[in-house]
C-alpha cells in the first residue's frame, strides 16, 4: 500500500510468513517460482533477462540472510536486479553477505545521533534505539510548536513547518500525519557502505 502512495505498483509480491516452520523444499520452490527461474545448465548462453528489475526484501536480518542467497542461486541477485534495503540492513552480517553486494540502502541522515547516544547511555545505562530517538524528537517538536501560542491548530502548524532536525534525523510532517524524512543512498560494496557511482 505504501508503494502505491508514491505511484509504484509491484508486479509481483511473495509473502514468506514463517520460513523457520517451512520445509526447505517448500521454501526453495516458492523462491524458484517467484524468480521465474530457467535452468540453463545445458546451455549457459541462454540465460533470459531477469523477471524483475527491482527487488525489495522486507524482514529482519535472519530473514534477509536466508532469502538473498536463494534469490541469487535462482539468477535473481543484485548483479541482475536492483536490490533495495533499509537502514536495518546496516549490520556486519548483511554487509558481509556475498549475495547482497551491490545492494542499495537508504539510511536516514542523523548528524546528532552520537550525541544522543552518549546522553541516553549516561542517563539510562543502556543503548538507545530508534524508537527512543523518535519519541524524544516528537515530544520536543510538540512542546516547541505548542509554545508558540498560535490560534492555528497544532496539527496545521506541524504540517506547515518547513521541517525539523532532530536526533532521529531531518523530517517534515505530512498532511496525513506521517513523517517525511531525508535519506542518504549508499551501496554495499566489498562488505562496506559506499556512495554509489551513479546517484
Predicted features, each with a name:
Residues 1-199:
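Extracytosolic ligand-binding ectodomains
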Amino acid at each position: 500500500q505504501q508503494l502505491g502512495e508514491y505511484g509504484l505498483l509491484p508486479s509481483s509480491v511473495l509473502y514468506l510468513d514463517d520460513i523457520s516452520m517451512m520445509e526447505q523444499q517448500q521454501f526453495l520452490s516458492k523462491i524458484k517460482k517467484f524468480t521465474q527461474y530457467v535452468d540453463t545448465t545445458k546451455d549457459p548462453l541462454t540465460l533470459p533477462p531477469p523477471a524483475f528489475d527491482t527487488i525489495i526484501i522486507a524482514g529482519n536480518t535472519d530473514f534477509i540472510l536466508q532469502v538473498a542467497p536463494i534469490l541469487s542461486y535462482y539468477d535473481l541477485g543484485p548483479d541482475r536486479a536492483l536490490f533495495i534495503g533499509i537502514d536495518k540492513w546496516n549490520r556486519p552480517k548483511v554487509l558481509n553477505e556475498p549475495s547482497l553486494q551491490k545492494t542499495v540502502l537508504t539510511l536516514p541522515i542523523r548528524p546528532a545521533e552520537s550525541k544522543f547516544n552518549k546522553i541516553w547511555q549516561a542517563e539510562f545505562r543502556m543503548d538507545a534505539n530508534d524508537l527512543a530517538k523518535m519519541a524524544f524528537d516528537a515530544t520536543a517538536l510538540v512542546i516547541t510548536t505548542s509554545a508558540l501560542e498560535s490560534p492555528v491548530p497544532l496539527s496545521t502548524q506541524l504540517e506547515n513547518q518547513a521541517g525539523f532536525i532532530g536526533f532521529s534525523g531531518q523530517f517534515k510532517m505530512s498532511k496525513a500525519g506521517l513523517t517525511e524524512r531525508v535519506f542518504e543512498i549508499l551501496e554495499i560494496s566489498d562488505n562496506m557502505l559506499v556512495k554509489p557511482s551513479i546517484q
